[in-house]
Each structure stands twice: as C-alpha cells, then as structure tokens.
Amino acid sequence: MNKPMLMLITFATSLLAQTNKASTGLKTDQSFNNSLSESVKLKEIADIYPTNTNFLTGIGIVAGLAGKGDSIKQKDLIIKILEENNIINEIGSNNIESKNIALVNVSLQVKGNTIKGSKHKACVASILDSKDLTNGILLKTNLKNKEGEIIAIASGITQPNNKLKGSGYTIDSVIINENQNINHSYNIILKKGNYTLINRIHKILTSKKINNKIKSDSTIEIEAKNISLLEEIENIKIETNPKILIDKKNGIILASENAKIGTFTFSIEKDNQNIFLSKNNKTTIQVNSMKLNEFILKNSNNLSNKELIQIIQAAQKINKLNGELILEEIDGNQN
C-alpha cells in the first residue's frame, strides 16, 4: 500500500516541499498556505471602528397615507408638531381629518463623526395609531443630538424595514448639516482575543509613535487624525504564532517555519505488515528540541505520517509544541 503524501511548507523561502508525491495527486488550496503564514496584515486579523457613536432623533410627519394615517383624536398634538417643524402651511386640516398623515419618530445612529453633507439611512416608527407608513412621504424633520442641537435633516419616502420584525420603516435621505465635535479615537478589535498578540500590536504601534492603549485582550484604542494613518495601521505586518495544520484523513502535515517541537520521550506501537513479526511492536522514540519541519524530514523515512501525527498531537498535549495546532481536512479537488 502506498504511503500517504507528506507535505511541508517552509515559509522562510516560500517554497512547498513535497515528499512521496507519486503516492497521491492531492493538491492544496492556496488559502491553506495563507492561513499558515506567520506574517499577516493587521486588517486580516482585526477590524478598526470609531469609538464614538452619535444618536440623533426627531419627531416628524409622514404624509400621503390615503386613509391609513393617524385618527383625528390627536389632531392638536399633530398640529403642534407641524408648527415646530415649520411645515404647518404644507398640511391642510383636511389631510389630518381624513387620516392621510401620521406622527412618527425618526432615529439615526452614526458610528464615528457626523460629517456635514454626508447621507445616511434612518429608522421611522409610528407614534400614534396609523396603520401603515409604506410609501408615505416623510416631511422635513429636524434630527437633534442629546444636547438638543439640530445636526441633520430627514425627508423622503418611507419603506418597510425588512430586517426588523414589526412595524419598522426606513428612509434613505438623511443629510447631516452640521459637523459635531470631531473625535479621532478608534478601536482596533481582534477577531479572536489574544493577550500575546494584542501586546505585540501595542509595541509595534508604540514604536511608530502612534498613541494607543490596551483595553482588553482583543481591543486597543488608538488616535488617528487622518485617513492615511488609518491606512498605514491597517497594513502593518504582524508576526503571528506559528501554525501546524494536520489533515489526518489524507496524511498531510503543513507547518510554518518557526513551529518547534520540544524534548520528550514517546512510546508508539508500530503496525508491522510482516506476518512473521509481532503485530504490536512497541518502539520508544526520543524527540529532541528542534524545528518541527526538521523533525519531520529527519523521521519521515522511519515513521509513517500517522505516527508523525500521533507524536505531534502528543507534544501539543504536554506543552512541547510551539505553534497553534489546526486539525482540518484539505479538499484535494480544489485547483
């Protein structure tokens, strides 16, 4: 029976060394090579978000509801809102009495700074007893911040918000008309928390004289006053932990250059195909500290891939493996 193919990746030279290639025609997808890379761009392992969020709200009127609007019970309140928004002259009393308009709450959440002239989507919700706001027209509505300052103007056609259950609606045309106090703080948030990695990023940022503060195992707060600095931070190269990928089914081992195995003794029962020898031939193996790639190359002629994988997994269990062990099945049909 042919021995399964053994593949080693050495990233120092960016070459793929293959042994026993003739035994299988298995191909590995480039994504596996990339996933084992020890040097990645920050944007591949983290996202950058503004630290501040602005909440803007306002009360407005949706017109053109053709009998599906608010009842006349709240006529006085509706008139008051129309006066506050300086649109009382645009709405006749007939529209109120014929249930053609509705009193609504308009809310907008802006992550990051509110920039004059920028356009946003807002949520619209009925306040009183209107039945349906679909295809209504939101008249000009002032949106204010928590200090009561008018920051944006909302208007446009209301559409059902399919992402929300219930009676939520949206409009696409909210225009910011005032800049608020500009905030230059952002959070770098790792996709997977790791104190070692977060401290490594902190040291790199500090060496580049970028103000930063570790907030948790997954978050660093930074100060960036321009887009070019954010772009530079996104593309910073980060050295990640060494990785070892094992495909037990196909007998494949992929190891990044700096993955290492420590010193320990391992006892294994070798399966002999010779019927005249004992079927359970126990062998003791002395493993010396070295790079994992070197260990595999040194022992590939004497040990099967299955046995090598057993040793690597044993090393990981007793903390003698320097590298993150990943168990995955590689699809050999990919090109």
Swiss-Prot record:
GO terms for biological process: bacterial-type flagellum-dependent cell motility. The gene is flgI. This is Flagellar P-ring protein. Assembles around the rod to form the L-ring and probably protects the motor/basal body from shearing forces during rotation. InterPro entries: Flag_FlgI. PANTHER family: FLAGELLAR P-RING PERIPLASMIC PROTEIN FLGI, FLAGELLAR P-RING PROTEIN. It is found in: Periplasm; Bacterial flagellum basal body. One of its GO terms (cellular component) is bacterial-type flagellum basal body, distal rod, P ring. Belongs to the FlgI family. The basal body constitutes a major portion of the flagellar organelle and consists of four rings (L,P,S, and M) mounted on a central rod. The keyword Lipid metabolism does not apply. Residues 1-17 form the signal peptide. Pfam families: FlgI.
